[in-house]
């Protein structure tokens, strides 16, 4: 029985090295050295058209150039590849095998040059940082678009908005209130919104001629994540105007707040799009706040590492289209109230 190979200074076993040599290996190296991308493209065109003149026209080359490429291909593969038949050139059996192997090779090379994919063939997961009160606004119009245009794309939303996670590639996009994009990031405005108040249907305050007379006396609800997202400052503004109690009832998210308001006399101040979504699901009434509040702007943020990626660019455009749909919906709602 043969002993394991070992060196002269150690008893450790070493894996024997397999050395590929001989005429066949040399022939393979010579064939690879003789092939280039232009030659493979010529082979593709010749197998498709089975006519040197038509293949040359397809490639934008002269007929003699394609004829020379065919001669070179015959030498590389040691096969005629295309022979004359009664109705034109006919591929040999070896050419037919090459015709089956060639498309995925060239498709891979083309993908290196143009990495954009057909979104209908996507099998990817897009991760977006999006607070829940933005998710209930954007996802209803966005998800049907994705189901139609990119049915295999998975969407995962995260409530945390963190620029560091964008930079490290943990998430792809972030949606929220960002005034200016920091260095290394890009920003696109999605929509502007104004604030509204949510009360339960039948709330005693709705019987008053002006809600401002009772607004400051009402018990308020607030979203616990407001201070992290940005519109918590509206709560502070109302407190300064003595229009909101300084210690509101904190709830974890917008839908929970809506359920709390339905069964109590609490009032919640949120962006109007959020209020509209909640009122569509629950017996709630939307009223204007007692004073004019600063507008609420929602933006899309991404890191520069993804800025030129064609798939990422496509996804950003689809999110912007969904945001535009919410603006059109707001216009329709406003017209119906007039």
UniProtKB/Swiss-Prot annotation:
SUPFAM superfamilies: Periplasmic binding protein-like II (SSF53850), Winged helix' DNA-binding domain (SSF46785). Residues 35-92 form the HTH lysR-type domain. GO terms for molecular function: DNA binding; DNA-binding transcription factor activity. Residues 52-72 bind DNA. Pfam families: HTH_1 (PF00126), LysR_substrate (PF03466). InterPro entries: LysR-type_TF (IPR050389), LysR_subst-bd (IPR005119), Tscrpt_reg_HTH_LysR (IPR000847), WH-like_DNA-bd_sf (IPR036388), WH_DNA-bd_sf (IPR036390). It comes from the Bacteria. Signal peptide: none annotated. Keywords: Activator, DNA-binding, Nodulation, Plasmid, Transcription, Transcription regulation. Belongs to the LysR transcriptional regulatory family. Transcriptional activator that regulates the expression of genes involved in symbiosis. Among other targets it acts on the nolWBTUV operon. This is HTH-type transcriptional regulator SyrM 1. It comes from Sinorhizobium fredii (strain NBRC 101917 / NGR234). The gene is syrM1.
